[in-house]
Amino acid sequence: IKSAKKVELKKDDGEIIDIQGKNIIIATGAKSRILPNLPQDGKKIIGYREAMTLNSQPKKIIIVGSGAIGIEFAYFYNTMGSEVTIIEYQDRLVPQEDKEISKALETNFKKNGIKIFTSSELINSKINGKSVSAIIKTANKEQTLNADIILSAVGVKSNIDNIGLEDVGIVSDNDKIIVDDFYQTNIPGYFAIGD
């Protein structure tokens, strides 16, 4: 993003061109948030994008995080027949939702065979050839869980690094571009939408 409502683009052949418009829409999407103790390799420890395009169904999957992304994939893989385990740092599933919703969801998931560890911290993860392990700390003890894949579902991070926001003066806070009710940034003619 450049000033004077210009965007610099790099074409497939390497040529760099400037495009100018009356308004600029910033819609750069998001990527999986990466935990230091859960580095994603895209094969055994994956993010939400890889979880949508696996070549084969895992027999066992550990899902770290129980927000919207984690819960959706837990339901999906359980329905497809995978053995699903959820690890959640907070004291309940979907901690942003009402407690009644969390309780009903947990009851339903357990009834369908999903294993749930709440108030549990992921200490470490390790790839062991064809399998992967997660070392977790619960209220009572440390234990190791094994699976074919670990899905990191601990949130998303906006793709706004190094795109020129600072050069133009567009304000961001906590990885989010600040917008008004019409999605316009603090700089007239620049809008931000999506993740």
Feature names for model-found ranges:
Residues 11, 29-30, 138, 151, ...:
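Short glycine-/small-residue-rich Rossmann-like dinucleotide-binding loops
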Residues 13-23, 140-149, 186:
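Core beta-strand elements of the Rossmann-like FAD/NAD(P) dinucleotide-binding domain
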Residues 34-36, 71-72, 77, 159-162:
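Glycine/Thr-rich phosphate-binding loops of Rossmann-like dinucleotide-binding domains
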